[in-house]
């Protein structure tokens, strides 16, 4: 595989699993050194395994840092300092090369599904709003701000924010979550202007992705989602072998759920979404900024 990111340094937040891990794998495979961030103790072993995998398989420098993005004002400088430490490990200050972050992927996020005056969960309160916006909005803002002085000075930097199709659809019960992702897309356009001399800034808009978050949404949400996925051209599924290969050890479970509870319309896979993120990190994407690029099988197009 070509290594267009050789020698670059990337930060990927929320990269212990799912889309973040898939992005880290793609960047490392193409030569980038990677700092992976994670939050919970339960993700420590997964993250350690990913660091070892990427380092040994691709011969790049990979480290992780555990920090709570819900406390963004504390987390942002910790992440930048960890990135500096990683950079110094392969490019010591004595070498004369200035610390630089080439790629920032704001991927970490949390979900929220709660109606106004929800009959089961009660009314949305300030605590729920703060929980979601702290991680989905404030953390990307403060981390991008902290990284900005260390971006390249020649417009070769790349920032990609991971949003959600929820920001476009207006799902029932997603006032808080969809609002947070809409805010991230708006900030994308602002940063594209403010950081134009250093980096392109784009947002990737994924649809449903096979993994923990979509599984936890459950049958009620899947039924609510059905009209949207029915109209998405790439989500049609009928047991295709290439799709089942992507599901790996969960192929049987995937096949059963998609056929029986998702109306034969499949979610995407983390690696498919990571492919779009990767595309926006390339040199060839340098004329694209301030954009929301869909990685949702045509789902957003279906509601235009």
UniProtKB/Swiss-Prot annotation:
Q: Which UniProt keywords apply?
A: Carbohydrate metabolism, Galactose metabolism, NADP, Oxidoreductase
* EC top class named in words: oxidoreductase
Residues the entry annotates as binding NADP(+): 19, 68, 107, 177, 181, 209
SUPFAM superfamilies for the chain: NAD(P)-binding Rossmann-fold domains
Q: Give the EC number.
A: 1.1.1.-
MF (Gene Ontology): oxidoreductase activity, acting on the CH-OH group of donors, NAD or NADP as acceptor; quinone binding
Check the record and name the Pfam families matching this protein.
Answer: adh_short
Q: What SMART domains is this protein classified in?
A: PKS_KR
Biochemical pathway: Carbohydrate degradation
The GO annotation for biological process reads: fatty acid biosynthetic process; galactose metabolic process
- Name the family: Belongs to the short-chain dehydrogenases/reductases (SDR) family.
The function of this protein is: L-xylulose reductase involved in the catabolism of D-galactose through an oxidoreductive pathway. Catalyzes the NADPH-dependent reduction of L-xylo-3-hexulose. Is also active with D-ribulose and L-xylulose, and to a lesser extent with D-xylulose, D-fructose and L- and D-sorbose. In the reverse reaction, shows activity with D-sorbitol and D-mannitol, low activity with xylitol, but no activity with galactitol, ribitol, and L- and D-arabitol.
Q: What is this protein called?
A: L-xylo-3-hexulose reductase
Which organism is this entry from? Answer: Hypocrea jecorina (strain QM6a) (Trichoderma reesei)
Cite the source lineage. Eukaryota, Fungi, Dikarya, Ascomycota, Pezizomycotina
């Amino acid at each position: 595989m070509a290594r267009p990111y050789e020698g670059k340094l990337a930060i990927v937040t929320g990269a212990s699993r799912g889309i973040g891990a898939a992005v880290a794998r793609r960047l490392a495979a193409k030569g980038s050194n990677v700092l992976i961030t994670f939050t919970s103790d339960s993700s420590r072993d997964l993250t350690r395994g990913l660091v070892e995998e990427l380092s040994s398989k691709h011969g790049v420098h990979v480290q992780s840092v555990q920090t709570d993005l819900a406390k963004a004002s504390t987390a942002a400088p910790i992440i930048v300092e960890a990135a500096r430490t990683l950079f110094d490990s392969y490019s010591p200050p004595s070498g004369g090369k200035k610390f630089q972050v080439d790629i920032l992927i704001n991927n970490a996020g949390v979900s929220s599904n709660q109606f106004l005056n929800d009959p089961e969960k009660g009314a949305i309160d300030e605590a729920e709003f703060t929980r979601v916006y702290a991680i989905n909005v404030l953390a990307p803002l403060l981390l991008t701000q902290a990284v900005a002085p260390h971006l390249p000075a020649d417009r070769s930097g790349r920032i990609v924010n991971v949003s959600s199709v929820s920001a476009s659809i207006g799902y029932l019960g997603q006032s808080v979550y969809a609002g947070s992702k809409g805010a991230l897309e708006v900030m994308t356009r602002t940063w594209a202007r403010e950081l134009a001399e250093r980096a392109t800034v784009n947002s990737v808009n994924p649809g449903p992705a096979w993994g923990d978050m979509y599984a936890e949404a459950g049958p009620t949400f899947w039924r609510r989602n059905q009209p949207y996925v029915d109209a998405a051209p790439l989500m049609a599924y009928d047991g295709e072998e290439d799709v089942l290969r992507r599901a790996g050890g969960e192929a049987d479970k995937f096949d059963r759920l998609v056929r029986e509870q998702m109306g034969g319309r499949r979610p995407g896979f983390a690696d498919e979404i990571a492919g779009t993120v990767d595309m926006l990190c390339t040199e060839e994407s340098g004329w694209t900024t301030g954009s929301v690029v869909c990685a949702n099988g045509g789902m957003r197009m279906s509601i235009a």
